[in-house]
Design a protein with these regions (language model features):
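Metal-dependent phosphoesterase core characteristic of DEDDh/y 3'-5' exonuclease domains
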Residues: 2-4, 25-69, 87-188
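Short acidic, Gly/Ser-rich segments with clustered Asp/Glu that frequently serve as metal-coordination loops
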Residues: 9-22
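Glycine-rich, highly charged phosphate/nucleotide-binding loops
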Residues: 74-84
Length: 188
């Protein structure tokens, strides 16, 4: 019985792909959500914002995600705490799944460089993974549908059959990612 973690991160910006994960200019994780399943049985879930500690949430990211500095300061946990809890879920999973997993896994490796060890960063990098963006693009192509398959909303509407309400909230995106993954596996 496989344990699968569906997860998503929201951040202060895009990773600087040309720079190492340990570069201080790399973005911070503003929210992590994860849902861990053994088959259809929900084993664990979490959804936390990170409290800024010397960094700001840009206005354009607040507009996109709805995460304000005020909310993050009031309801957020220290970013290291969020990272540690997320790492526990990643370690406990056999497979990790995200929509655009290169992005989310990189954000976790950036956090590992800030708060953890090189071994933790490598552990995250080596974890068995699946990407609903890649799987979704293949599915759209196989169905002869137009579109890139990059947007979570686009893939969700095409494969699951409905719009996502509240996208760019990590928990909403995790639920949508799992729905896409289940539909693709069901059709395989």
């Amino acid at each position: 019985m496989t344990i699968t973690l569906f997860f998503d991160t929201e951040t202060t910006g895009l990773p600087i792909w040309s720079s190492p994960s340990g570069d201080p200019a790399q973005p911070h994780m503003t929210q992590f959500a994860g849902m861990m399943f053994r088959d259809d049985h929900l084993l664990a879930s979490m959804n936390f914002m990170s409290r800024p500690d010397g960094w700001e949430i840009p206005a354009e990211l607040t507009e996109l995600t709805g995460i304000t500095m005020e909310d993050a300061n009031k309801f957020g946990l220290p970013e290291e705490t969020v990272y540690r809890m997320a790492l526990k879920m990643i370690r406990d999973a056999d497979t990790i799944v995200a929509h655009n997993i290169p992005f989310d896994a990189r954000i976790m490796r950036i956090a590992a460089k800030r708060f953890g060890t090189e071994d933790e960063a490598e552990e995250i990098k080596a974890k068995r993974r699946e990407c609903t963006m890649t799987l979704g693009a293949r599915e759209l192509k196989a169905r002869g549908m137009t579109g890139t398959g990059k947007s979570l909303g686009e893939v969700h509407k095409a494969i699951v059959g409905c719009e996502i309400s509240g996208a760019h909230n990590a928990l909403v995106d995790v639920v949508a990612c799992r729905q896409i993954w289940l539909k693709i596996k069901e059709n395989a």
